[in-house]
UniProtKB/Swiss-Prot annotation:
<dbReference type="InterPro" id="IPR003742">
    <property type="entry name" value="RlmH-like"/>
</dbReference>
<keyword id="KW-0949">S-adenosyl-L-methionine</keyword>
<dbReference type="Pfam" id="PF02590">
    <property type="entry name" value="SPOUT_MTase"/>
</dbReference>
<feature type="binding site">
    <location>
        <position position="94"/>
    </location>
    <ligand>
        <name>S-adenosyl-L-methionine</name>
    </ligand>
</feature>
<feature type="binding site">
    <location>
        <begin position="113"/>
        <end position="118"/>
    </location>
    <ligand>
        <name>S-adenosyl-L-methionine</name>
    </ligand>
</feature>
<dbReference type="GO" id="GO:0070038">
    <property type="term" value="F:rRNA (pseudouridine-N3-)-methyltransferase activity"/>
</dbReference>
<comment type="function">
    <text>Specifically methylates the pseudouridine at position 1915 (m3Psi1915) in 23S rRNA.</text>
</comment>
<keyword id="KW-0808">Transferase</keyword>
<keyword id="KW-0698">rRNA processing</keyword>
<dbReference type="InterPro" id="IPR029028">
    <property type="entry name" value="Alpha/beta_knot_MTases"/>
</dbReference>
<comment type="similarity">
    <text>Belongs to the RNA methyltransferase RlmH family.</text>
</comment>
<protein>
    <recommendedName>
        <fullName>Ribosomal RNA large subunit methyltransferase H</fullName>
        <ecNumber>2.1.1.177</ecNumber>
    </recommendedName>
</protein>
<dbReference type="InterPro" id="IPR029026">
    <property type="entry name" value="tRNA_m1G_MTases_N"/>
</dbReference>
<dbReference type="GO" id="GO:0005737">
    <property type="term" value="C:cytoplasm"/>
</dbReference>
<keyword id="KW-0489">Methyltransferase</keyword>
<feature type="binding site">
    <location>
        <position position="62"/>
    </location>
    <ligand>
        <name>S-adenosyl-L-methionine</name>
    </ligand>
</feature>
<keyword id="KW-0963">Cytoplasm</keyword>
């Protein structure tokens, strides 16, 4: 499956850039990965840029109002999407003000990383690590120890 990772901006802090690069590289062992960095001067402009980048791919928005997954359940969800014929999924992290209600309404799924408020850079890193962890679970590899 192809995973399209869309972020408003890119990691600014060294730890987040380094971590993103490492987990993106690891994730590419299991999936085709495309990364799009978008920007906008307003929340509306960011949402439009995310939609444009996602194209026709089902869109999964990282949003505090969304569904929370364990690593195992995320792996199961991604496997089900692949079996359901989705060749690509787009995952999007918005800017500091989040997503517009209009964009939320167009998403296939809202996914919450948890109830904690995370800095933007850390949320990006958690996204790519969570996708990598889910891929290793699906592959039956020992990275995830439950």
């Amino acid at each position: 499956m192809r995973l399209h990772l869309i972020t408003v901006g890119e990691p600014k802090l060294a730890y987040a850039r380094s971590g993103w690069d490492e987990y993106e590289k690891r994730l590419r062992r299991y999936h085709k990965v495309q990364v799009s960095r978008v920007s906008g001067k307003t929340q509306q402009a960011e949402s439009e840029a995310i939609l444009k980048a996602a194209g026709k791919s089902p869109l999964i928005l990282l949003d505090p109002r969304g569904k929370q997954f364990s690593s195992e359940k995320l792996s199961e969800y991604l496997d089900a999407e692949a079996l359901g014929g989705h060749g690509e999924l787009a995952f999007a992290i918005g800017g500091p003000d989040g997503h517009t209600d209009a964009l939320r309404g167009q998403a296939k799924l809202l996914w919450s990383l948890g109830e904690l408020t995370l800095p933007h850079d850390l949320a990006m890193l958690v996204l790519v690590e969570a996708l990598y962890r889910a891929a290793t679970i699906s592959a039956g590899e020992p990275y995830h120890r439950g």
